[in-house]
From Swiss-Prot:
Places the protein is found: Cytoplasm
Enzyme class, spelled out: ligase
Organism: Xanthomonas axonopodis pv. citri (strain 306)
Motif position, 'HIGH' region: 41-51
EC number per UniProt: 6.1.1.18
Molecular functions (GO terms): ATP binding; glutamine-tRNA ligase activity
Keyword Aminoacyl-tRNA synthetase: yes
Coiled-coil positions: none
Residues engaged in binding ATP: 42-44, 48-54, 237, 285-286, 293-295
Protein name: Glutamine--tRNA ligase
Pfam families with a match to the protein in the record: tRNA-synt_1c (PF00749), tRNA-synt_1c_C (PF03950), tRNA-synt_1c_C2 (PF20974)
Length: 579
């Protein structure tokens, strides 16, 4: 992909968070002339809603200040990575409305990392250690006790270079040796107690095959990857704040800017020389109630078949939210509403749902659909009577135009819109009572037909011929208006009624001896057969609608077709979880 300046027409003119203030100051002082950011996910799973905040910040910041944002796949742990995730990550970023200046992989820089590690050894800043993982833990110390130096810490430069070369050659088994930074085993920051920089893993890599039996650790690869790409502002969540001293140590001790020879492998590949010193800045991660976002727990939900896959519309993956009917505009609005700060907080799920309602209220055309059908026969219309009515596609926006809706003697209405014995304040159909049929006139129920079990199976009634749209009688006041579809023309559809996956605000809370599995909401998915007007059935996958009086729905991106329509409820018209 060519390197072009990021643009984002949807970005607000001015945002005031502390990160943008830093960027403004850096540009004003001349410290930087072009802002460079990156989004660096590991391709070991599907992105979730928490990643949306990072994507919108990394790409949005670059766009806002006319800069560049790379997508870098942090593929340094090949045992857990898969090309399926690589494709999904790119799909998610584009879906949110962003594009990258360059698509890079940490594996593009493996030779640079190796040369950098050799430099650290020559400079006396790294050593090969033979301690096992368990021994390293024992030597590390605790938060209140300093660690102890490895017995291998004082190996000579020559011995370390030889051992590291033999690690590279594949001579040793997994776990036999590591390359460790030589920093300070008494540091109050445990991340600085001689952390590992390289480990031995004889695992085939999706990009480099079996070329490398050693792989760099995250902190080493991440910091140098930023430096290689000339990233000016490396944005990450607060849990990496304690890692920043190690990040800076790696950048400063390797000093790619002062040692351009380390970059020669990139130049040999035709990649540009862009090295610069990056600055890491931390912000609060996105935490939302009624969700879990641990990759381990999301994986368990899928593998234990507690959900229907990574793109199950109840999942908080971006693929799941997209299939549920969440829109890129709603996701970006949500990130804006949440804001950027250094204070961790728990965001109410209703904020996310509210952003979707706000977007779809403006963007979704209206249609009629009946989810729990009950037949209403208008007996004063002749057998076989049909006509075509004109309906607005959006009551607030004439640019959406109009559509034709068939109307007939026999209709489907919602079962819940009729009450044989109405509760107090009831404003819908009752025996002998009148109701306005949306866009068609005023109807009355004269007869209730039941089956042998006493269940209502049909209503028979009358349509006031003087109350048709445009007639004087249409102005007559009645208590309520209901929607309908023509029984002769409506298309049967599968309608999936989705709700929150968990029934409690904090499903991660295990204080009562329960786990998130115990808090799964049994009402989070209900499949029903309903009827939709013909123009809804003809919709393309991912087309969103407001089904009038019912909620916002989307044509399923996987299963929907004109012949077999499938609609997912994205969100109810109102917050049904409000306390």
């Amino acid at each position: 992909m060519s390197e072009t300046l990021a643009t984002d027409a949807t970005a607000p003119a001015e945002k005031k968070d502390f990160i943008r203030q830093i960027v403004r100051e850096d540009l004003a002082s001349g410290k930087h002339t072009v802002i460079r950011t990156r989004f660096p996910p590991e391709p070991n799973g599907y992105l979730h809603i928490g990643h949306a905040k990072a994507i919108c910040l990394d790409f949005g910041l670059a766009a806002e200040f006319g800069g560049l944002c790379n997508l870098r796949l942090d593929d340094t742990n090949p045992a857990k990575e898969d090309p399926e995730f690589v494709v999904a990550i790119q799909d998610d970023v584009r879906w949110l409305g962003y594009d990258w200046a360059q698509l890079r992989h940490a594996s593009d820089y493996f030779q640079v990392y190796y040369l950098a590690a050799q430099k650290l050894i020559r400079d006396g800043h790294a050593f090969v250690c033979d301690l096992s993982a368990e021994q390293v833990r024992q030597y590390r110390g605790t938060l209140t006790e300093p660690g102890r130096n490895s017995p291998f810490r004082e190996r000579s430069v020559e011995e370390n270079l030889d051992l590291f070369a033999r690690m590279r050659a594949g001579e040793f088994p997994d776990g036999a040796r590591t390359l460790r930074a030589k920093i300070d085993m008494a540091s109050g920051n445990i991340n600085l107690r001689d952390p590992a920089l390289y480990r031995i893993k004889h695992v085939e890599h999706q990009n480099t095959g079996n070329a490398w039996p050693i792989y760099p650790m995250y902190d080493f690869a991440h910091s140098l990857g930023d430096a290689v790409e000339g990233i000016t502002h490396s944005l990450c969540t607060l849990e990496f704040e304690d890692h920043r001293p190690l990040y800076d140590w790696c950048v400063d001790k390797v000093d790619l800017v002062g040692h351009p020879e380390l970059l020669q492998p990139l130049l040999d590949k035709g990649l540009p020389r862009e090295a610069a010193k990056p600055r890491q800045i931390e912000f609060s991660r996105l935490n939302i109630n009624y969700t879990v976002m641990s990759k381990r727990k999301l994986t368990a939900l899928v593998e234990e078949q507690l959900v229907d896959g990574w793109d199950d519309p109840r999942m908080y993956t971006l693929q799941g939210l997209r299939r549920r009917g969440y829109t890129p505009a709603a996701m970006r609005l949500f990130v804006d509403r949440v804001g950027i700060s250094k204070q961790n907080s728990l965001i109410d799920f209703s904020v996310l749902e509210g952003c979707l309602r706000e977007d779809l209220d403006a963007a979704a055309p209206r249609r009629m659909a009946v989810i729990d059908p009950l037949k209403l026969v208008l007996t004063n219309l002749p057998e076989g009577h049909t006509e075509t009515l004109q309906f607005s596609n959006h009551p607030k926006d004439d640019s959406f135009g109009t559509r034709e809706v068939p109307f007939a003697r026999e209709l489907w209405i919602e079962r819940e819109d009729f009450a044989e014995v109405p509760p107090k304040g009831w404003k819908r159909l009752v025996p002998g009572g009148e109701i306005r049929l949306r866009g068609a006139g005023i109807a009355r129920v004269d007869e209730v037909i039941k089956n042998a079990d006493g269940e209502i199976v049909e209503l028979r009634g009358w349509l006031d011929p003087e109350s048709r749209p445009g007639m004087e009688g249409a102005n007559r006041k009645v208590k309520g208006t209901i929607h309908w579809v023509s029984a002769a023309h409506a298309v049967e559809a599968e309608i999936r009624l989705y709700d929150r996956l968990f029934s409690v605000e904090k499903p991660d809370d295990e204080s009562e001896g329960k786990t998130y599995r115990d808090y799964l909401n049994p009402e989070s998915k209900r499949n029903v057969r309903g009827y939709v007007e013909p123009s809804a059935a003809m919709a393309a996958p991912e087309q969103a609608f407001q089904f009038e009086r019912t909620g916002y729905f989307v044509a399923d991106r996987r299963d929907h077709s004109e012949a077999t329509p499938v609609f997912n409820r994205s969100v109810t018209l109102r917050d049904t979880w409000a306390k």
